C-alpha cells in the first residue's frame, strides 16, 4: 500500500523482544539512484545508548502497521559506518523534500513537499509537488508519478512532461496489511468471545 513519507517520521519502532516501543524514526534515508528508502535514522529511547546503533535498515522491518514499525529487537540497529551503501548515501546529504521540479525545457513546476512510498518495497511511488504561488490558485498541489522522472541531481528533479495532474487518491491512505507472522501488538478481536458469552447467557435463561 502507499503511505505518505511524512507519516513515517516520528514513527514508533516496536520491539517484539521488549514488547513495546523502543525508539522513533527521525528521518528517511533515500537512495537517489533508485528512489527508494533504504533506512531510517532513529532518535530517542534505547538508541540514546551509544552502544546501540541509530539506523534501521528497511530489510530489518518485520511489519508496517498503524502502531509503528515492528522489529525483532534493537540488535538489528546499525551504525552508519557498518553498512557501506548507507554510509555512501549519507555522505551525499541527499534530501528529496525541497528539490525543485522542472521540465526538460527547465520550466519550473514546483517544489517537492512530500512523497508516497510503497510500504512493502519502500520505493518512492509519487512526488507531492507544491506549485509556485501564482499557479497555486488553479493547481495548489500536484502528484508526479516516478515514471515521469527522467533525472535527479542535488538541486532539482526533471520530469518528462509539463505536469502530471493526478490528485492524491484513497490508495495513498493506510490500508489493512496482512502480516506474515503473528503481530503481538495488534489488539485482539473479542467478537468470538462475545458471541460465546451471548450463547452462554441464553442457555442459562432457558434452563431457568
Where are these regions (language model features)?
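Peripheral interaction segments used for macromolecular assembly
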Residues: 1-208
Amino acid at each position: 500500500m502507499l503511505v505518505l513519507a511524512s507519516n513515517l517520521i516520528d514513527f514508533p519502532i516496536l520491539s517484539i523482544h521488549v514488547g513495546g516501543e523502543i525508539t522513533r524514526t527521525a528521518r528517511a534515508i533515500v537512495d537517489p539512484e533508485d528512489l527508494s528508502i533504504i533506512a531510517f535514522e532513529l532518535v530517542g529511547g534505547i538508541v540514546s545508548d551509544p552502544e546501540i546503533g541509530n539506523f534501521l535498515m528497511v530489510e530489518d522491518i518485520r511489519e508496517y502497521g498503524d502502531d509503528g514499525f515492528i522489529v525483532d529487537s534493537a540488535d538489528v540497529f546499525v551504525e552508519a559506518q557498518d553498512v557501506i551503501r548507507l554510509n555512501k548515501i549519507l555522505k551525499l546529504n541527499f534530501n528529496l523534500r525541497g528539490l525543485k521540479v522542472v521540465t526538460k525545457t527547465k520550466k519550473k513546476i514546483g517544489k517537492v513537499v512530500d512523497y508516497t512510498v510503497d510500504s512493502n518495497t519502500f520505493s518512492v511511488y509519487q512526488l507531492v509537488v507544491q506549485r509556485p504561488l501564482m499557479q497555486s490558485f488553479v493547481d495548489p498541489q500536484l502528484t508526479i508519478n516516478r515514471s515521469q522522472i527522467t533525472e535527479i541531481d542535488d538541486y532539482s528533479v526533471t520530469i518528462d512532461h509539463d505536469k502530471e495532474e493526478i490528485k492524491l487518491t484513497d490508495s495513498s491512505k493506510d490500508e489493512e496489511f496482512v502480516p506474515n507472522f503473528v503481530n503481538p501488538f495488534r489488539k485482539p478481536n473479542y467478537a468470538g468471545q462475545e458471541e460465546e458469552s451471548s450463547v452462554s447467557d441464553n442457555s442459562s435463561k432457558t434452563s431457568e
